[in-house]
């Protein structure tokens, strides 16, 4: 009976037209609706943005206070201290492509490909950071050599570990959403929090260790100098209080670091691209590096931002000396810095609105160039505190654009790269790590140029007044040199090919690629189901 039923069924099937038979077999294949636009909630964006604070908190504290800490609190000699700072910066720049290479070789896990780096580097990073601000009791006569090795080791170790946090965090921009607009919005949130991080880092470190200043005495020529004798006769209790103040500040910043990392880990989930997930393994690093460095839009973008970053870093690196010696606003430096950072914080949302309304290239031209008139004003004006505050607030507007725009434009370059090289997964960390590398390279160049220029101008170390040529050199480093670099950077941005029309085309092409990958995945699933049924 069963055999006869099977024969009738086969015979009926043979009488049906092929098209009808195929249609009758298809009900198991449900046509999937196009995916709705992926929208990140405000909570998701805030959790992502908070992850940018640790790098800025620690970097700001180290940038402004490590030198004076090594010299006056840890009692490291000036030459070893300068070696620690220089080697630390050089190592910091080197670790970015190194970590980018390691991440590109990482495989996807249940937590993602980037999150494990963030999770496992965090506890080690805060331990290394805390030990930077700890003064060990070395045996008598070995303080100088042992102290040099101690601070060099933990400074380089911390820079390595914080890079293991920051490079994957930067690359995470590409994996929080497949929508350009959502990534841009999340980047704006991130830049706002990062600027707030610099403000908080400066405030915490500055307020807690504000009393950690070497005493000054009037010398016979009428100039105020740091008294070596006073430093040596400083009471042990007072020095111990200063050391404890640095440890307290380090503990608070380390706690904020952990809290921010915890929020990031809980609130953000990596999203893997469909067309990438179909690739068996990541592209070899050096092959990916050749492709990335051969991608024209990326080279033009980092070249433009290399010049503009160098301009702003010249201002940043010499701002304290400029306020102290050229403008003679010794007691206003922290307040002026706070005015710049608060202005940047409040104007980042405005720049985010501007770039979505008028385009990113337009935002670059207006945002970066807006600093030029105020830099000219600083170069020409006489000493005036009110005008200086106005310039500081206006400078914050440009700083906000300089913070936001590179990180908003990098994802566009990566999207363009993926369209040209769709079978090259794992290259995102290379893009971000080498951008950070070139940024830190610019920081090192600005430090070297500034120090050399001041040395040629006969800068008097530890003095509270300087020769006129030093004041003039500082004015050039803070005004004319940045103006020239900004103009060169803007000229390079003229060559940058990804405008708003190109972005829209890339967005449509990427969407088509995702839909193709999705339908391919559905076909593979249906084939597997059919095979199991048969």
From Swiss-Prot:
Keyword check for Disulfide bond: yes
Compartment(s) where it occurs, according to its Swiss-Prot or TrEMBL record: Cell membrane; Endoplasmic reticulum membrane
Name by which UniProt lists this protein: Sodium-dependent lysophosphatidylcholine symporter 1
Gene: Mfsd2a
Annotated keywords: Cell membrane, Disulfide bond, Endoplasmic reticulum, Glycoprotein, Lipid transport, Membrane, Symport, Transmembrane, Transmembrane helix, Transport
Keyword Lipid metabolism: no
Post-translational modification: N-glycosylated.
Stated consequence of mutating residue 190 to A: Abolishes LPC transport
